[in-house]
């Protein structure tokens, strides 16, 4: 565990992300829960703790600073909009990535992790209870049945951009943002989006220890 903590702290430094010791401990406890549950429920194909740290925790931690910047920009652009109590929906959350990581790092954000697989939702709820994360909730539902409103709707390896935005559009708040984590150049998926969805930024990420392309596709509803 000591080696994992050192690797985590090194990754946080590379990401220029400052967290409290308590939050770092929560991230490591969360990683331990993933390891424990995966032995029985196969939450993730990644089994080695060091690989979990890189492929899951650090990969998800890479979105924290971009998310904070976008929310700060939203406050500046729409000062009459309440951004003090942000609700975020993590679609197809699986083992809680990136939703649980966001809940730990951003306690001011209420995070709902939705999945259609009951055992994965049960895991999210167990994480919330064990780590005492009052801002984290697991929802066993289809995303298209949710109405929100959510200021941010995110996904990581859930579906194509077109399907992601179509299925979750009813849950997006006015002036809300879609955050889609992608592992490759999303040009083809962007081209397939309807006119009602506008991509306003493709943000390339560097994940410490991960030699692979990562990016965030930021979208909002278009006036068209």
Swiss-Prot record:
Gene Ontology molecular-function annotations: rRNA (guanine-N7-)-methyltransferase activity
Domain of life: Bacteria
GO cellular component, one term: cytosol
Family: Belongs to the methyltransferase superfamily. RNA methyltransferase RsmG family.
Enzymatic class: transferase
Gene3D superfamilies: Vaccinia Virus protein VP39
Protein name as catalogued: Ribosomal RNA small subunit methyltransferase G
Keywords: Cytoplasm, Methyltransferase, rRNA processing, S-adenosyl-L-methionine, Transferase
Organism: Albidiferax ferrireducens (strain ATCC BAA-621 / DSM 15236 / T118) (Rhodoferax ferrireducens)
InterPro entries: rRNA_ssu_MeTfrase_G (IPR003682), SAM-dependent_MTases_sf (IPR029063)
Location(s), subcellular: Cytoplasm
EC number: 2.1.1.170
Function: Specifically methylates the N7 position of guanine in position 527 of 16S rRNA.
């Amino acid at each position: 565990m000591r080696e994992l903590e050192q690797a985590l702290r090194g990754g946080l430094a590379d990401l220029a992300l400052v967290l409290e010791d308590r939050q770092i401990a929560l991230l490591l406890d969360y990683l331990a829960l993933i390891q424990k549950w995966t032995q029985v429920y196969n939450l993730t194909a990644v089994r080695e703790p060091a690989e979990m740290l890189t492929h899951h925790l650090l990969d998800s931690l890479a979105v924290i600073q971009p998310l904070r910047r976008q929310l700060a920009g939203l406050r500046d652009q729409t000062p009459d909009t309440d951004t003090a109590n942000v609700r975020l929906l993590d679609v197809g959350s699986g083992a809680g990535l990136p939703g649980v990581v966001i809940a730990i790092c951003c306690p001011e954000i209420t995070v709902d992790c939705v999945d259609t697989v009951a055992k994965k939702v049960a895991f999210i709820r167990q994480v919330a209870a064990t780590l005492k994360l009052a801002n984290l909730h697991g929802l066993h539902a289809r995303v298209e049945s949710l109405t929100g409103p959510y200021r941010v709707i995110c996904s990581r390896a859930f579906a194509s951009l077109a399907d992601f935005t179509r299925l979750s559009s009813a849950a997006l708040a006015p002036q809300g943002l879609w955050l889609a984590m992608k592992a490759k150049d999303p040009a083809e998926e962007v081209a397939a989006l309807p006119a009602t969805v506008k991509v306003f930024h493709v943000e390339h990420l560097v994940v410490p220890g991960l030699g692979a392309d990562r990016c965030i596709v930021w979208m909002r509803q278009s006036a068209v």
